[in-house]
Amino acid sequence: MTTKEQCEMLYKSAFGESPEFDKMLFDLFFENIEVLKIGDEVAAMYFKIPCFLILDNTRIKADYIYAVTTADKYRRKGLMSKLFADTQTDTDTVYFLKPSSEGVIAFYEQAGFKKIIGTRAQSNATIEVNDNFKKLSALCDKPQNEYPIMIKGNADIDRLTFEYTLE
């Protein structure tokens, strides 16, 4: 089985939105997947989708972390912590994600992320995404006005405008 096929299976076992969304996600962003393998098997993966943080009119490189998952048999072995440590090393990049539940926030905090408020309202910090991201986001429900966001990197903010969540 190819790496892409393994990633698709792992993703669908953990998340699997709709067939249309899943296909578009992998067609548009497969090249942005970070993978940790045990032998030839994908044990952990996530999408690291490039975008920009616009902070007080300054454009900063950012990566949206999406669909963080580890295969059941490899959970609680520190693999995702290792994958994060190995792949989130650019000190000029801001990394951010929308946690799938309150239960995973402690893990992200241990990985260096800070919880802030995500909003659809205007703020001095806004995420700018490319057209492919906008197409994919159009297939998703929009979040409520405020929701948790986790952020890591050199950006001292407590609110982040992010209209194009993938959920």
Model-derived regions: residue spans:
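Conserved acetyl-CoA-binding loop-helix of GNAT-fold acetyltransferases
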Residues: 65, 70, 76-89
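Short acidic/polar capping segments at secondary-structure boundaries
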Residues: 101-104, 113-114
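Short amphipathic alpha-helix that is part of the acyltransferase structural core
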Residues: 1-50, 58-60, 64, 119, ...
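Low-complexity, intrinsically disordered Gly/Pro/Thr-rich segments
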Residues: 146-152
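Conserved acetyl-CoA-binding loop of GNAT-fold acetyltransferases
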Residues: 109-118
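Conserved GNAT acetyl-CoA-binding A-motif
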Residues: 84, 89-101
